[in-house]
């Protein structure tokens, strides 16, 4: 193996995202790999009974995506990753990460893991699912 060529960083834009991206930066520097960042907005539509509370022309999904783009840009600026490719996708987090890994032909996925306790351990997690289903190497950065 000659090293990684394309590292995809999946971030949730919480404070731990900086640590995840920093770890990926270290690896990219070591291997001379391309870096890309991905955030998935998992939009859950408001149920019809709740729609009456919102003014009709509100584009919640669009606002969530624009806010995520701003935060992803700020993260890249803070880490000196202005030239890194970045994507904000809408959909199921696991499905979108798997789709983007395949589209981008990433050979390493880097993501963070918040510690799970009690019932959450039995329910499974996005991270656990991705480790088993992603067609490339996965580095899970422990954040807790």
Where are these regions (language model features)?
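Structural beta-alpha unit
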Residues: 1-2, 30, 76-109
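Small/aliphatic-rich secondary-structure junction motif
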Residues: 2-54
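General small-molecule cofactor/ligand-binding pocket signal
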Residues: 38, 85-89, 139
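Short, hinge-like loop/turn segments at secondary-structure boundaries
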Residues: 52-56, 103-104, 127-129
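A short acidic, glycine-rich active-site loop
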Residues: 55-68
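Glycine-rich, Arg-bearing micro-motifs that act as flexible, cationic patches
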Residues: 108-129
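Short, structured coil segments at secondary-structure junctions
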Residues: 126, 134-135
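Short, flexible loop segments at boundaries between secondary-structure elements
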Residues: 138-144
């Amino acid at each position: 193996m000659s090293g990684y060529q394309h590292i995809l960083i999946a971030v949730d834009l919480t404070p731990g995202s900086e640590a995840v991206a920093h770890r990926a930066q270290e690896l990219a520097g070591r291997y001379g790999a391309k870096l890309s960042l991905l955030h998935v907005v998992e939009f859950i539509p408001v149920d019809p009974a709740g729609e009456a509370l919102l003014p009709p022309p509100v584009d919640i999904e669009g606002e969530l995506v624009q806010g995520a783009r701003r935060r992803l840009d700020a993260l890249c600026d803070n880490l000196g990753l202005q030239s890194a490719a970045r994507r904000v996708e809408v959909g199921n987090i696991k499905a979108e990460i798997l789709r983007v890994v395949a589209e981008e032909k990433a050979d390493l996925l880097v993501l963070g893991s918040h510690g799970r306790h009690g019932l959450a351990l039995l329910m499974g997690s996005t991270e656990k699912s991705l480790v088993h289903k992603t067609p490339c190497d996965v580095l899970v950065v422990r954040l807790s």
